[in-house]
Each structure stands twice: as structure tokens, then as C-alpha cells.
Design a protein with these regions (language model features):
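Short, acidic/turn-prone active-site loops that include or flank metal/cofactor-
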Residues: 33, 57-59, 134-136, 209-211, ...
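N-terminal positively charged helical leader segments and presequences
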Residues: 1-93, 259-281
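Short, glycine/polar-rich helix-capping loops at beta-to-alpha or helix-loop-helix junctions
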Residues: 37-38, 136-146, 211-217
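Short beta->alpha connector loops at strand-helix junctions that form conserved
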Residues: 56, 77, 106, 132-133, ...
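Active-site helix-initiating loop/hinge in glycosyltransferases
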Residues: 10, 106, 113, 235-237
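RNA substrate-binding interface of SAM-dependent RNA methyltransferases
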Residues: 16-19, 23, 30, 91-191
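Structured adenosyl-cofactor binding patch, chiefly the S-adenosyl-L-methionine
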Residues: 15, 123, 146-154, 215-267
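Active-site/ligand-binding-proximal alpha/beta "capping" segment
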Residues: 182-232
Length: 281
């Protein structure tokens, strides 16, 4: 496998990728049981004179270096996250009205957490994830086969961006474009999630389970948010915490939409009074 290529495995991940980006598929491997599910992709590969192989599950274990392939593996052109410059450029095109959220993951590199969070983001319609404070040597391995399998196809609906830093980009979005930074924290003056009103242009920062949100980003946060619990455990898994926060964001966003689109009712008494005035005129 070349450095410009990567393997994606897992049925939902492969089917979503094959549907959205068939031209980037170099080669396909699948068991006989999954041949029908990949029918359109296999026909496309054959028309482009690209190879596909029907193999046993044991062979796929070796190809994927994992037993969690669900009978399907694709060799594709490597997906690389965008950088800070691309993030700022893309966010300038975001509509100025309505609710917008940028999900920022601070120092999170575990592929299973990243995949689970990406799946959740896709479910709630979040379009962009910014991975910040990621060491350069770790950036190339973030978008792995394990990441795609855990994302269950969500990765094709979410754009990823990555930086070894992150504070400067968030500051630029705050000062130049009016975004608000909300960071999760269990310490200090954190507000309960259920008492928070999310702004229309929101950067939601999630920290790693071992380190939390970095001090440099906490310093520029407009608000700190916590999820109240029993205290029996120190914290939630970051993927679980993200799901809870995004659900609350989606709830507030839906309420905002309903309030904006709901027609204003004229009180009954006012209508009657208006009618009497017309009769007397």
C-alpha cells in the first residue's frame, strides 16, 4: 500500500464511501456474502479497469489487520484533513444567519473516540470538526480504518481539519467573525448544560479524557460548560459527552427555528377592539 492510499473497512463505512466517492476507490475486497451489496461499485470498478477481489473472511483479517471488517474492505485514495487556513476560508462562506456549530476536539487522537464523535456529528448535521493540538507525527494516522469503521459511514458527511495548535484559529474566528467559544470543563466556574443558552455561532470545544481542554483554549473561552451527574465517576467518555451536548444543541436549535417560523398570534381582545374601531369609523 502506498503512502497516498489507505484501507477502509466495515460494511456501513465502505457502502457510504462507495456511494459518495466511487472514483477514489482503487481496489475492493469483499466476501461472497457481501458481493450483492457492493454490486454497483464492483461494476464501476470493472468499467474503470480497476480490480476487485472476492476473498474469504480469514483473508480479509490479514488484509485489514483486523477482524472487525464485516466482510468488506476498500483501498482508497488517502483522505487528509484540511489545515487551519482552509478552515478559516471555509467558515467565511458560512451563512451569517441561522445556527452554526464548529465542533473542536482538543488533543483527541483515539480513532474509536474520533469515529464515534464523527458518527454523532453526522447524525446531528454538524458539517465540520476541527482537531486541534494534534502533534504533527500523529496527524497522518488520525483518519484510519478503525476511525472509518467506528464512524459507520458518518465520515463522508463531515469535513475534518487538523492543526498542531488551534488557539490562533479560534481567536481569529472570535474577533473577526463573531463566533463564541464554549469549552467543556468540570472545574472552576462551569455552568450546567441545562442552564446554558447556546449562541447562533458556536465553537464547542471537547477535551481529551486524560488532559481535558488545554489551558490556552480555556483562557479564550466565552463560557465553560459541564454535564451534571452523581459524582460517582470523575467524567464521561468524550464521545458520550459530545453526544449529550450535541443533542442539547440540536434541541435548542429546533426551538429557535420554531420560534422564528411560528406566526405571531394577535390577542383575541385586540382583534375585537380593532373590529369595533372599524365599525365606528
Amino acid at each position: 500500500m502506498k503512502s497516498t492510499e489507505q484501507k477502509i473497512y466495515g460494511r456501513n463505512a465502505c457502502l457510504s464511501f462507495a456511494k459518495s466517492s466511487p472514483k477514489t476507490v482503487i481496489r475492493a475486497y469483499c466476501t461472497e456474502e457481501n458481493r450483492g451489496r457492493l454490486g454497483s461499485l464492483l461494476k464501476f470498478l470493472a468499467s474503470q479497469k480497476r480490480a476487485y477481489h472476492i476473498v474469504s473472511s480469514d483473508d480479509l483479517n490479514k488484509i485489514c489487520e483486523s477482524e472487525h471488517h464485516e466482510g468488506v474492505c476498500l483501498l482508497v485514495e488517502r483522505m487528509q484533513p484540511g489545515d487551519e487556513t482552509q478552515l478559516l476560508k471555509d467558515l467565511q462562506a458560512v451563512p451569517k444567519i441561522g445556527s452554526n456549530l464548529l465542533l473542536c476536539l482538543d488533543g483527541i487522537t483515539n480513532p474509536h473516540n474520533l469515529g464515534a464523535i464523527t458518527r454523532t456529528a453526522a447524525h446531528f448535521g454538524i458539517k465540520k470538526i476541527f482537531l486541534c493540538n494534534i502533534p504533527v507525527e500523529s496527524q497522518k494516522s488520525l483518519v484510519s480504518g478503525a476511525f472509518h469503521r467506528t464512524a459507520e459511514g458518518g465520515a463522508v458527511h463531515v469535513e475534518l481539519y487538523c492543526s498542531a495548535e488551534g488557539k490562533s484559529a479560534l481567536e481569529a474566528l472570535k474577533k473577526q467573525h463573531g463566533w463564541n467559544v464554549f469549552a467543556t470543563s468540570s472545574y472552576g466556574r462551569s455552568q450546567s448544560l441545562h442552564k446554558i443558552s447556546f449562541p447562533q455561532k458556536l465553537i464547542l470545544v471537547m477535551g481529551s479524557e486524560s488532559q481535558g481542554v488545554s489551558d490556552s483554549i480555556l483562557q479564550i473561552a466565552d463560557s465553560k460548560v459541564c454535564i451534571n451527574g452523581t459524582g460517582h465517576v470523575e467524567s464521561l467518555n468524550v464521545a458520550s459527552a459530545t453526544a449529550i451536548l450535541l443533542n442539547e444543541y440540536a434541541r435548542q436549535k429546533e426551538n429557535y427555528r420554531s420560534a422564528v417560523s411560528r406566526p405571531t398570534a394577535i390577542p383575541t381582545r385586540a382583534v375585537r377592539a380593532e373590529g369595533r374601531n372599524r365599525k365606528g369609523s
